[in-house]
Amino acid sequence: MATLLCDLQERSAKVERARHWDSKQGSSNSDVASGGSEVAGNSGNNSYLGDDVGWKIYPYRFLQLLQHLEQLQFTIQAPRHARLGISTVRMWSLRPYYNYDSYLEKDLIQPDVPHDSLIWALLRYVGRAVDRWVSRTFQPPRIRPLHANDPPAEASL
């Protein structure tokens, strides 16, 4: 990750030097913005950042994304056949860059293998039953509203 970050910083420095050189020559980078040959990445040594279009146009965005990803702690997803729970995929910290909800709907809740869907249905059923039992068993005591004919609290002591 660190070498990739250094490589990106070096490439973005090349972009700035090339832009400075272009401004000295009196040309603008309109061909980059309008989709010229340099955007396609086939202009040889004249291309700023190689073949990747995104690095050419927005190098600082990729640097920001890499620096952010470097600070995150997340678990890589398990193989499809080994997934038994949502805890195997922890992508909440990537939420700005990754649509977690659609991932759950498409990939985890509706697996490809039929027996996996049976396991998921069983897990959901057991989870709901446990939730109902816990909510019934450990309910906080209900506080009765005071009525006019109730004795004052001091009298009960």
Swiss-Prot record:
Keywords: Virulence. Induction: Expression is up-regulated more than 10 fold in toxin producing cultures. The keyword Oxidoreductase does not apply. Residues 17-43 are annotated as: Disordered. Transmembrane segments: none annotated. The keyword Hydrolase does not apply. Pathway: Mycotoxin biosynthesis. Part of the gene clusters that mediate the biosynthesis of AM-toxins, host-selective toxins (HSTs) causing Alternaria blotch on apple, a worldwide distributed disease. AM-toxins are cyclic depsipeptides containing the 3 residues 2-hydroxy-isovaleric acid (2-HIV), dehydroalanine, L-alanine which are common for all 3 AM-toxins I to III. The fourth precursor is L-alpha-amino-methoxyphenyl-valeric acid (L-Amv) for AM-toxin I, L-alpha-amino-phenyl-valeric acid (L-Apv) for AM-toxin II, and L-alpha-amino-hydroxyphenyl-valeric acid (L-Ahv) for AM-toxin III. Gene clusters encoding host-selective toxins (HSTs) are localized on conditionally dispensable chromosomes (CDCs), also called supernumerary chromosomes, where they are present in multiple copies. The CDCs are not essential for saprophytic growth but controls host-selective pathogenicity. This is AM-toxin biosynthesis protein 15. It comes from Alternaria alternata.
